[in-house]
Structure formats: C-alpha cells, structure tokens
Amino acid sequence: MATSLDFKTYVDQACRAAEEFVNIYYETMDKRRRALTRLYLDKATLIWNGNAVSGLDALNNFFDTLPSSEFQVNMLDCQPVHEQATQSQTTVLVVTSGTVKFDGNKQHFFNQNFLLTAQSTPNNTVWKIASDCFRFQDWSSS
C-alpha cells in the first residue's frame, strides 16, 4: 500500500497532467480540429450526446462534421484511477464542464469526461484519450 505522501504526489501529478491536457484539448478542438485525433488512442471511443464513435477514422469523420466551436471550461476535476481497475495502466479520470458555442447555434452548457492513459514513447510519456463522453447540460424549459 502506498503511503499517503506517495498518493498525494500521484494525485498532484495527475492534476498537473489533466490541466495541461485540458488546455491542449480545447485549444485543438477550437483552432486545429484536424489534429484532434492525435490525442486519442487508436481504438478510443467517444460518446457524444449518447451517440458512440469508435476508432480514429470514425472520430476524424465525426469531428469534420462539427461546426467551428468556442469552448470555455469553467470547471476541471481529476483523479487517478486505481491501478487494480486498469490492469496497472496509469490512468486518470478528467471531468470538465463549461460552455460551448458552435457556429450557427446557441451557446450550450456542457459536461465532458475523459479517461486518459499514459503511453510511453522513446523520449517521454504522453497522455492519450481511451474514452471520451460529451453531453450538453442545458436546463429544461418546462
């Protein structure tokens, strides 16, 4: 069992990675969308308002259909996922919420969560999206 200091260090590292990831993700979504799939694992799944999209080609096609966007993240939360649940794969749960305006549409509140996994490369470790769930969170007018 890790000491509480080790766990705190682990959580701090996860939070730094999540903050960096969120900045990169939403900037890429708004300004360089064609590069967005570089942030996903080859077999990643996106659930967009209940509609599933899996694999890089399908993700690319899906992102191409979206109008240009302006995301504003108002909340970020993250936590490491216990290694027993991920077969010792370093994984972080990232939850965001905020507002988004797609060109030609009204502004919406959104909630998005990501499961990020650490992928080792010869020079460093990069975080890739294994799972992404996006949902509009607009208030009911009833």
UniProtKB/Swiss-Prot annotation:
Keyword list, A-Z: Cytoplasm, mRNA transport, Nucleus, Protein transport, Transport
Transmembrane segments: none
Major location (coarse): nucleus
Domain NTF2: 17-136
InterPro entries membership: NTF2 (IPR045875), NTF2-like_dom_sf (IPR032710), NTF2_dom (IPR002075), Nuclear_transport_factor_2_euk (IPR018222)
Claim: Lipoprotein is one of the keywords in the record: no
The organism's place on the tree of life at top rank: Eukaryota
GO biological-process terms attached to the record: mRNA export from nucleus; poly(A)+ mRNA export from nucleus; protein transport
Entry keyword Protein transport: yes
Entries under Pfam families matching the protein: NTF2
Complex and partners: Associates with NXF1, NXF2, NXF3 and NXF5.
Entry function: Regulator of protein export for NES-containing proteins. Also plays a role in mRNA nuclear export.
Name of the featured protein: NTF2-related export protein 2
Gene behind the chain: NXT2
